[in-house]
Amino acid sequence: MRTIALLLAYDGTDFAGSQWQTDIRTVQGAIEAAWEALTQEQRRIVLAGRTDAGVHASGQVAHVQTATRHSLATIWRGLNAHLPTDVTVQNVGEAVRDFHARYSAIEREYRYLIDCAPVPLPQLRHQALHYAGTLDVTAMATALKLLEGTHDFAAFTTATPSQRSTVRTMYWTRIVERVWFDRRLLAIELAANAFLQHMVRMIVGTLLLVGRGRMTVDQFGEVLAGRDRRLAGPTAPAHGLTLTAVRYPPGLIRWVEPLERQQGATKVEQPSSYVHEE
């Protein structure tokens, strides 16, 4: 048996979340159907993280235990040929035998996108939350920094504290301002060892209260310390959220190089320099 790792990207708009559900369209279900069509194997695909309906991914990771002898390049091309257009396999890799997409992960990264233009852009309606009002980004960034380190994030989850630990370690946070098509976009980015259910969306919803002047930075800190969901702001809509990366200790996965995928897994040496002349 082999353990194959998959790097996935998907538009979550038309999926009822990532995790398999009976008779409902999910990311896991789409990948398992494509895998069976390619290999004639019925295998369970294991995802690194669960995403809700409407949430996107550009760096989701999955693994599958398989007996197939297909090359990695064939798996990459074959899965993409069988998958719908709103989910793709960006890369494939050979993983160590005991690799687990979820339990081997040491870091997850998310980005929440806010479109701050006066009028929404239709092309962004499924990828960014539109907010036309004024936001105090400095106050939002200051409040966001309070989350870094190891804390009990019970105030920012719908999970029942008695069911599981709500302590997580936030490695870093930042708010990046970008201009795209003459529009001002805010990207709220967070990295942690793991995230709780709805955690990022609840953090963003509370940060928006800070940005709008309806909550102070100190009050935001009190929400975190209070560990009470009722103190936090509303849950931000799902469509602005993207899982951007899942990270692992080195040596667990040998990802295929881009040229190997293009050349059918034949290694091609890249030139040391490249000059393009018109």
Swiss-Prot record:
Isomerase: is it a keyword of this entry?
Answer: yes
State one molecular function term (GO).
tRNA pseudouridine(38-40) synthase activity
SUPFAM superfamilies (UniProt xref): Pseudouridine synthase
Q: Which UniProt keywords apply?
A: Isomerase, tRNA processing
Query: What InterPro entries would the database entry show?
Result: PsdUridine_synth_cat_dom_sf (IPR020103), PsdUridine_synth_TruA (IPR001406), PsdUridine_synth_TruA_a/b_dom (IPR020097), PsdUridine_synth_TruA_C (IPR020095), TruA/RsuA/RluB/E/F_N (IPR020094)
Q: Name the source's superkingdom.
A: Bacteria
One of this protein's Pfam families, by short name? PseudoU_synth_1
A Gene Ontology biological process term:
tRNA pseudouridine synthesis
Gene3D superfamilies, from UniProt? Pseudouridine synthase I, catalytic domain, C-terminal subdomain, Pseudouridine synthase I, catalytic domain, N-terminal subdomain
Give the EC number(s) listed in the UniProt record.
Answer: 5.4.99.12
Catalytic activity field: uridine(38/39/40) in tRNA = pseudouridine(38/39/40) in tRNA
Binding of substrate, residues? Y110
Q: Does the keyword tRNA processing apply?
A: yes
Q: Which residues form the active site?
A: D52 (nucleophile)
Q: Mind telling me which residue stretches traverse the membrane in this protein?
A: none
Q: What quaternary structure, including any partners, is listed in this protein's UniProt entry?
A: Homodimer.
What the record says about family reads: Belongs to the tRNA pseudouridine synthase TruA family.
Outline what the protein does. Answer: Formation of pseudouridine at positions 38, 39 and 40 in the anticodon stem and loop of transfer RNAs.
Q: Which HAMAP family match?
A: TruA
Descriptive protein name: tRNA pseudouridine synthase A
Please give the organism: Chloroflexus aggregans (strain MD-66 / DSM 9485)
Gene behind this protein: truA
